[in-house]
Curated annotation (Swiss-Prot):
The active site is at residue 58. GO terms for molecular function: (3R)-hydroxyacyl-[acyl-carrier-protein] dehydratase activity. It catalyses: a (3R)-hydroxyacyl-[ACP] = a (2E)-enoyl-[ACP] + H2O. It comes from the Bacteria. Keywords: Cytoplasm, Lipid A biosynthesis, Lipid biosynthesis, Lipid metabolism, Lyase. The gene is fabZ. This is 3-hydroxyacyl-[acyl-carrier-protein] dehydratase FabZ. It comes from Brucella anthropi (strain ATCC 49188 / DSM 6882 / CCUG 24695 / JCM 21032 / LMG 3331 / NBRC 15819 / NCTC 12168 / Alc 37) (Ochrobactrum anthropi). GO terms for cellular component: cytoplasm; membrane. Its main location: cytoplasm. The keyword Ribosomal protein does not apply. SUPFAM superfamilies: Thioesterase/thiol ester dehydrase-isomerase. Belongs to the thioester dehydratase family. FabZ subfamily. It is found in: Cytoplasm.
Amino acid sequence: MSDANQTKLEAADIQDLLAVLPHRYPFLLIDRIVDIDGDVSATGIKNVTINEPHFTGHFPEKPIMPGVLIVEAMAQTAGAISLLQRKTGRPGVVYFMTIDNAKFRRPVIPGDRLLLHVKKIKQRANISKYECIAEVDGVKVAEAEVAAMISTAEESQ
């Protein structure tokens, strides 16, 4: 996308995320995005709390954030920065396409602040692939590569 079609945004708060992502409670898995560099890289922030519904069953005696939700949070971060860079009036929809090389290194538990580092490694037409690393307190807890397709709102109907 050319600079003429992009906006410049360095951080996104929850209101910005709600404006571009279709996800809502309990499936909006990022609270904020910082260090945004166009649609190339950024860091999502997820504050993990015991109040999240998945902890009632995963696992009641030792709550651990499911790995699939960590990957989803990575994908939401990548999708959000792609959509946030589009000019106002050009809404889009992100479709999660693939997950590759997912690895889970350490459990994520309530009270953790999950940092989701995403970096675009490939783009072809409207499909982007991102390298993602999740960290807690500077320690890598998970990693994956995710790909998504961005379409305009008109194309998705």
